[in-house]
Amino acid sequence: MTIQHTQDLAQIRAMVPEMRRVKSIHFIGIGGAGMSGIAEVLLNEGYQITGSDLSENPVTERLVSKGATVFIGHQASNVEKASVVVVSTAINEENPEVMAARELRIPIVRRAEMLAELMRFRHGIAVAGTHGKTTTTALVTQIYSEAGLDPTFVNGGLVKSAGTNARLGSSRILIAEADESDASFLHLQPMVSIVTNIEADHMDTYGGDFETLKQTFIDFLHNLPFYGQAIVCIDDPVIRELIPRISRQVITYGFSEDADVRIEDYHQEGQQGKFTVVREGRANLDITLNIPGRHNALNASAAIAVATEDDISDEAILKAMAGTQGTGRRFDHLGEFDTGNGHAMLVDDYGHHPTEVDVTIHAARSGWQDKRLVMIFQPHRYSRTRDLYDDFANVLEQVDVLIMLDVYAAGEKPIAGADGRALCRTIRSRGKVDPIFVPEIEQLPSVLANVIQDGDLILTQGAGDVGKVAKQLAALELNISKMLG
């Protein structure tokens, strides 16, 4: 399916004159990856953007540099001049800005509703799934950019080649990460939808019922028009089970023999994955992917499937795969350093679900077989730790050295027996690895200094503030004397 992408922004804006009545858009929680991306696109479209967050970060600083007004802290006065208020899933009804907006009768919309407005008159490509959304979104973006199509994109993480997680393009293409955590991706009405995989996560949203989660993904795909396309990973057993229930054109990808876009002969050489992509009716592609892991080969094949259906040249696909710099905090190689006791490599990864942690460990083992793997793991949310406790224990015992931080609560209250200390006890009892529990994150550099050896691969893992620790360790160059203070 070849799509005409030449419609310009002036034409898109002319289609929605009512939206131009909106003068000021306020984002509560503007510093988050998903919120900031939409804010940046709207800012570049000419809207007055304000927002609030609990603290400054590089994202808020970037928005301010582009003309946004960002308040630190949440207070009622921040929304007084807003035409509409956008809220993230982390914002509750007791937030003073939400309460003030209701009092002032200012419309309140969720992040996905605003993303849906951006997508309404564009050729939308939405990327959903439990794992791999951010990297897949970045790879689709990279291909379309390499093809000269200048897409708008809104991603849940930094697209390193672009230096941002969102950008307003000049074409009518919009590539967006679609968030299933609160089922708000049902607001989106794209032309193409990718589903990478489906696992039990964010189950509180779905009443603890996996069947409800599966049906929600089907409903998401049925938001496609009848001429739209569902690009799905047939390697995933849940997706394979659901395919007969999808009443849209389905294109499959994966390592499976019956995949429409099939991966063959995968092997990893350090940071790069190399494999062949087989497509019916098209030439095979010998891919060099500049990010490691079989899971990233799957993400790449999803992007290749979309591009193939849109008749994008093989040359653009190959250049995008070889040239990708990946995404922030996804097997993010922060450097190799002289520690004072030899050399060590530092990698930072956002994965916080057992499946994500497992594929990251396998990528590290495959690319650097001679290195001792030292993982600094921070569990994310007490509820996830409780629900996936045994899975976490099974995965984490694969590393050589495990340094465990306590749970990053993300607003949740503690749950007895579902914390870092309990996980350490369980893993230690199995006898494969003796975890080191670090109750205060500030203690981590000195603890690591007493563990690190020549040739180590240090992997910081998790969705909380362990990413800040990774940057701190990089700034200290993993130097033992500096880490000891």
Curated annotation (Swiss-Prot):
It comes from the Bacteria. Its EC number is 6.3.2.8. GO terms for biological process: cell division; cell wall organization; peptidoglycan biosynthetic process; regulation of cell shape. It catalyses: UDP-N-acetyl-alpha-D-muramate + L-alanine + ATP = UDP-N-acetyl-alpha-D-muramoyl-L-alanine + ADP + phosphate + H(+). Keywords: ATP-binding, Cell cycle, Cell division, Cell shape, Cell wall biogenesis/degradation, Cytoplasm, Ligase, Nucleotide-binding, Peptidoglycan synthesis. Its main location: cytoplasm. One of its GO terms (cellular component) is cytoplasm. This is UDP-N-acetylmuramate--L-alanine ligase. It comes from Vibrio campbellii (strain ATCC BAA-1116).
